[in-house]
Swiss-Prot record:
Residues 43-81 are annotated as: Disordered. Consists of two distinct domains, a catalytic core and a N-terminal extension that is involved in tRNA binding. Residues 43-66 have a biased composition (Basic and acidic residues). This is Serine--tRNA ligase. GO terms for cellular component: cytoplasm. Its main location: cytoplasm. It comes from Haloarcula marismortui (strain ATCC 43049 / DSM 3752 / JCM 8966 / VKM B-1809) (Halobacterium marismortui).
Amino acid sequence: MLSRQFVREHPETVRDAIERKGVTGVDLDEILDIDEEWRELKAEGDGLRQERNEVSSKIGELKQDGKDEEAQEAIDRSQELKDELQDIEERADELESQLEEALLELPNIPHESVPTGEGEADNVERYREGFDDLRDLPDEVVPHYDLGEDLDLLDFERGAKVSGGGYQFVKGEGARLEHALIQFMLDVHREQEYVDVLPPIPVNSDSMEGTGQLPKFAEDAYRVGARQDDDYDSDDLWLLPTAEVPVTNMYRGEILLDDDLPVKHQAFSPNFRREAGEHGTETRGYVRVHQFHKVELVNFVRPENSYDRLESLLDEAAEVLDRLELPYRVLDMCTGDMGFTQAKKYDIEVWAPGDDMEDGPDRGGRWLEVSSVSNFEDFQARRAGLRYRPERHESADYLHTLNGSGLAVPRVLVAIMEYYQNDDGTITVPEPLRPYMGGQEVIEGSEKIGESAVGAGEKE
């Protein structure tokens, strides 16, 4: 959330952010008008309050002097002022409520280093890693969704039967590989001095508002026990779309001490999102689904340290791919593709060679986003009331929040299935994951179960 004072004093900066981020449905002039009327009413109320205090202070003296008629006039005037003041305060409270709601619709201001652009085509590639020494791949890499079904690692048909489209079963060695990835990621980040958190899965509306998911993106989240389009209040529950929500809000409304900072938490969780994208090859399989696992990295830092921390956070997230020797690139996200809440954002995209896409690298395959690494500055902190006290005797100030996936598990799994694929249709287990799989080096798959497998010629 932007402060009222900032919006009031820098309207053109805010207007520019609205335009550059492509935010629609926001009337900044109306917000400024509400703020101006609110300030005028507050000033008028202060004047009436002062006049009433002066009138009231004379009543006792007038009575003592026997000036009963003048005393009654003062009493009547005091009551008139009280009634006027009540009307003004009620209107001011109404405007303040409107203003608070309107401020939630304003996007964060992009950092000066953010490239200007309208969409993903305008993002700037910062660097690539892992392409100088690629492993030998099969002449034709089988896409993960076909290979996963062939080896009985992924079952989309039964997932749809149980829960609907966009859900899946991860089975056998596929499930073991996913568990291995999760534990490996957590261990990597523990080495980076992250403290583990196991968060609650349902989160309330105040928490969703604190990190910026509400009110802007309510349609993308799963709501518990209510219709999606019903009005919500602070007690309503949502299935978390990312562990960023509960972990950031863990300290909501609190004041941290200067020597607490930086705070670095990591949280593994399932994540739930209604929006599953368009149908087709780009979203087929385990790439864009309604439920997926992720390790989230959340940082709370002093404002002056947040951009140095952003670069370190980027390195911490990317280290998972470095150790797995998976090729990837880092993008500096442009204003039109960076998001509503971010001041600056990097995306880490892993290379998956199984499907050739127009926006993929020259050698074929495609890019899969596995992490967005973001600095929110004090945008989330203002919404959630996250402050720190620089010195014990000083006033509290808003801290800065950052987060990034460390990483999104399904897409890393997809990249492993395609990049570590062998000519015989097996998958080599990356060396760092073998200790988590009992030393297993190769995934060969399992025999399928059921009469349908016999009919399909997949089982004798």
